[in-house]
Amino acid sequence: MMMMSNLPNDLVEEILSRVTVTFMRTVRSICKKWNALTKDRSFTNKYIRNIAALGEREFLMIKEFSIYLVGVNLHGIQNNNFDLSIELKGKLISMDNTIRRFCISQIFHCNGLFLCVSQKDMDNRLVVWNPYCSKPRWIKPSYNYRTVDRFALGYDKSCGSHKILRLFGDNLNNLEIYDLSSNSWRVPNVTLERDIVYMQPGVSLKEKTYWYARDKESEN
């Protein structure tokens, strides 16, 4: 019987590209060769193509301050007939114990990175987490974080850097941006609309963040 270690590299890549993301950390821990292979860009692209070919979309769900991966198969949506297959794939965990103790209330996604926000008021911590590599990055605030603050995670193509947007203050009229490349906050020279009320935390969809908001005049 041929052992896995004796198989051709292209065959090993094909096999590993069909492993679900919840078991990828286990795969990487088996041997250095597999760890290096699964972090290669060509493997990542193939992995994404395989998932797309299944007609399945994956969503993140927060339950009891932890993150779970949920798979939704969309093949059943044809001719206005809805037959969705929903599967709880597993809990996303980190080897870093500080992440495990972090009470997550909001999460935003961009290019494989997660921005996690604590549910505790005045908890001066944000974390940017790459679950694929299990590497958390703690972000220090310029001012104390509050549960009413609004956040977003994005990518600036002009400089090749991920950035965090934060709205804060009594009326969320203050804006600052954190650059992950320079590890620093800055206040952009922009004026925010003062007549907008942000009703709920943002929702991350297809690398963009959306907020449910309305005019102050419509509150009555």
Curated annotation (Swiss-Prot):
Name any one Pfam family assigned in the record.
F-box
Which InterPro entries does the record associate with it? F-box-assoc_interact_dom (IPR017451), F-box-like_dom_sf (IPR036047), F-box_dom (IPR001810), SCF_F-box_component (IPR050796)
The highest taxon in the source lineage is: Eukaryota
Q: Which residues belong to any copy of the F-box domain?
A: 1-51
Q: Which SMART domains match?
A: FBOX
Protein name, per record: Putative F-box protein At3g20705
Species, as recorded:
Arabidopsis thaliana (Mouse-ear cress)
